[in-house]
């Protein structure tokens, strides 16, 4: 599972809920939540508006808790660079949400005989301003 690492999980500007969250209740679901010591939900951060959410779905939380899923925090830089690579090589502009999954691929090791399937959802054209402004930095 790829989660939004934001500016890095050590910075506090992140939405890496599984890695940094504590068990809590959000929107009626018991799951990992980014919260302070008093249990108050804190504002997460991600370059992707679709990923800056302080909770995680209970199914993903359970898979992570049982160690049935590998969870990787992908920071903004990694996601953007992975998106640029897909766009350059394949002509596909991924949405920022999918760019995080692409960024996770770089952190994994595969054997030549492995079959890897990654779905690219959404449309990157809605994120074009973010991609362009990131490139100007």
What do the predicted segments below correspond to?
Residues 2, 10-11, 104-137:
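Catalytic phosphate/nucleotide-handling subdomain of diverse soluble enzymes
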Residues 3-92, 133-137:
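Active-site/ligand-binding loops adjacent to catalytic centers
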Residues 54, 95, 126-128:
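Short, electropositive, low-hydrophobicity segments enriched in small/polar residues
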Residues 76-81, 100-110:
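A short, acidic, amphipathic alpha-helical segment used as a generic capping/interface helix at domain edges
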């Amino acid at each position: 599972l790829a989660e939004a690492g934001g500016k890095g999980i050590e910075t506090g500007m992140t939405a890496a809920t599984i890695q940094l969250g504590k068990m809590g209740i959000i929107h009626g679901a018991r799951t990992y939540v980014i919260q302070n010591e008093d249990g108050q939900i804190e504002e997460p951060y991600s370059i992707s508006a679709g990923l800056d959410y302080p909770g995680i779905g209970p199914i993903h939380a359970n898979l992570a808790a049982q160690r049935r899923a590998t969870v990787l925090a992908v920071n903004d830089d990694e996601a953007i660079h992975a998106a640029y690579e897909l766009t350059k090589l394949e002509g596909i502009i991924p949405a920022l949400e999918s760019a995080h999954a692409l960024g996770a691929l770089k952190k994994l090791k595969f054997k030549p005989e492995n079959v890897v399937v990654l779905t690219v959802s959404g449309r990157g054209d809605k994120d074009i301003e973010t991609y362009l402004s990131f490139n100007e930095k």
